[in-house]
């Protein structure tokens, strides 16, 4: 779990690295600052058109290490990990929700949200097919019902990899 200090460090790192990575053709998807197995770890998740490989992760690591050292925003010793966002890629920006329209997603709100669909009870979780981002809300089809979740109410949204569907397509 990320505390206030951890959020602050992650946000400082994001502001510092985002323009540099964009210049180099990468999208900074997410920054995580957490204590794992007794050590501080800074995780930087990147993406680019066509996907991210190990060479990209190594290149970004070599680019950001000196920037982080000079900026000195992180006091304790830490491990730096650079990777792709993975199959369960987080969705944050409005453009993310349009780019991944048609994909299966899981959306979690900060608290129960009422009125996301006509007659729907207040709820905190939705899993369905992403339709896109319209008028400040994320639209998704949950079992044939269109739900609109206000973007400012979303705590977390991720792509949800459909293993069974992928296996069926390969047969």
Swiss-Prot record:
Main location per the UniProt record: cytoplasm
Q: Which PANTHER family match?
A: RIBOSOME MATURATION FACTOR RIMP
The record's Gene Ontology cellular component field reads: cytosol
Q: Which organism is it from?
A: Anaeromyxobacter dehalogenans (strain 2CP-1 / ATCC BAA-258)
Q: Does the keyword DNA-binding apply?
A: no
Job of this protein: Required for maturation of 30S ribosomal subunits.
| Protein name (Swiss-Prot/TrEMBL) | Ribosome maturation factor RimP
* Cytoplasm in keyword set: yes
> Which family, according to UniProt?
Belongs to the RimP family.
Q: Keywords, A to Z?
A: Cytoplasm, Ribosome biogenesis
Known Pfam families for this protein?
Answer: DUF150_C (PF17384), RimP_N (PF02576)
GO terms under biological process: ribosomal small subunit assembly; translation
**Compartments it resides in:** Cytoplasm
- Supply the InterPro entries for this chain: Ribosome_maturation_RimP, RimP_C, RimP_C_sf, RimP_N, RimP_N_sf
């Amino acid at each position: 779990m990320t505390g206030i200090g951890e959020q602050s460090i992650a946000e400082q790192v994001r502001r510092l690295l985002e323009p540099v990575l964009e210049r180099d053709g990468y999208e900074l998807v997410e920054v995580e600052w957490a204590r794992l197995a007794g050590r501080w770890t800074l995780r930087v998740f990147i993406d680019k058109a066509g996907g991210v490989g190990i060479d990209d992760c190594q290149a970004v690591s070599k680019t950001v290490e000196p920037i982080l050292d000079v900026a000195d925003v992180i006091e304790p010793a830490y491990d730096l990990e650079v990777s792709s966002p993975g199959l369960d890629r987080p969705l944050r920006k409005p453009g993310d929700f349009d780019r991944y329209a048609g994909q299966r997603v899981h959306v979690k709100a900060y608290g129960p949200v009422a009125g996301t669909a006509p007659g729907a009870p207040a709820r905190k979780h939705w899993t369905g097919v992403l339709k896109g981002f319209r008028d400040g809300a994320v639209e998704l089809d949950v079992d044939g019902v269109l739900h609109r979740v206000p973007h400012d109410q979303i705590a977390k949204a991720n792509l949800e990899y459909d293993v069974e569907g992928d296996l069926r397509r390969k047969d």
